[in-house]
Design a protein with these regions (language model features):
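Extracellular/lumenal and peripheral-membrane lipid-interaction modules
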Residues: 15-198
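Bacterial N-terminal signal peptides
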Residues: 3-15
Length: 198
């Protein structure tokens, strides 16, 4: 799974309780690994698009993120749970605010919250994934909260850049920029409880 897709999923964190299908298990994590391997193989071989979309359940994605890719999550983010609704993606996670302290550049708009919060707090977001053109997606945040306190989108932008900056991506991930879907996918459709990958 590419960093862009992992980042996109991690970005979308919301306050609703995860659905029952969101349970994390090694079996579901392995199912997701196998689906991603199939997509990757198909893309490398340049095969035509699938006739039937691949379905990914919330449980498969949550299991994969937490059990298989947990160590690769952005700095300070853990326990990510994703929920799919019609054309919307929601997620919730825990953010270690102590890892934000001592940054060379403070995150504007977060200073006040950091003054009275510490340790791990819930971070929640909801947003919409839209397909800009075949194979290209974009994300729009509808709501973001840190420890149940609404935070401006600009704070989330800065958190995402901070969390995704690496040697291969020195500027981090810009949540407003369109991005190429991984595995030569043409589109992703979100429905209650699942994502359909074409």
């Amino acid at each position: 799974m590419t960093n862009a897709l992992v980042t996109l999923i991690v970005l979308l964190v919301t306050g609703g309780a995860p659905a029952a299908d969101s349970a994390v298990s090694p079996v579901n994590a392995q199912a997701m690994v196998e689906k991603l391997a199939s997509l990757e193989k198909r893309a490398k071989l340049g095969k035509p698009p699938r006739k039937v979309p691949m379905s990914v359940s919330e449980s498969e994605l949550n299991s994969y993120l937490n059990l298989t890719r947990g160590s690769e999550m952005p700095k300070g983010l853990s326990d990510v749970m994703v929920r799919f609704e019609q054309d919307r993606l929601m997620a919730r996670g825990m953010l270690d605010l102590d890892q934000l302290r001592g940054r060379a550049q403070p995150i504007e708009g977060l200073d006040g919250l950091l003054g009275f919060l510490s340790g791990k707090v819930p971070v929640e977001m909801t947003g919409r994934l839209r397909i800009v053109s075949e194979g290209v997606g974009a994300f729009a945040i509808d709501d973001a909260r840190l420890a149940t306190v609404p935070v401006p989108v600009t704070v989330i932008e800065q958190l995402v850049v901070w969390a995704t900056t690496s040697a291969e991506s020195p500027k981090g991930f810009d949540i407003h920029s369109p991005f190429r879907l991984p595995y030569a996918l043409r589109r992703v459709r979100l429905e209650p409880g699942r994502a359909l990958l074409d």
